[in-house]
Amino acid sequence: MNYLLEYCKQIEAGNIVVGKELGSTLTKLRLDLTNPKYHYDEKPGDLRIEFIETFCKHTKSPFNGMPFKLTLWEKAILQVAYGFKMSDSKFRRFNEVVLLIARKNGKTTFVAGIDLAEFFLSKGVDIVCASNTSEQANILFEEINNMREASKALEKRTSKNIFCIKFGKKNNNKSRHNMNKSKIKKMSAQSKNKDGYNIEVGCIDEV
């Protein structure tokens, strides 16, 4: 299903209310679906949607322990962010997404699910949770870890230390030669060392 078109359809039917700026952005994106400059592929977004809804669970009350079922707008933004590609190069059109959401509307939970999807679906990448302060950067990092621990399938393949979340268990002596080397780390403006990261996904909060 094309969730971008379905989202626009629900807005036009009056079932969903959006602001003027978002409405204009959606109109442009819908027109770009037929623009020969771009190719739209639903599969990359669908892959991440399937991962989140299969393996991720809520960790906060009142939904603690319940499966994370994405809303229509969340599915739409994942398809758009990963689905639009340049027709000539096949590179992704969008490398940055600005997400403006009011407090207590699930922003951290949503981003944590995306980070876990990238962690498991990519290889050898650094996923960084960043903010102005270490305390703020730690909020997303801990939500990712809580979501990881809530899933037996994810937890048994990974571990956490004071520096990062990584593949492999602490007491497992099995060779890491063929193991996924991806890591999830946290970083703030207060961090002394900001170099040496191969950042595939950078989530910047409260900037």
Locations of regions flagged by a protein language model:
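Phosphate/NTP-binding elements of NTP-utilizing enzymes
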Residues: 1-207
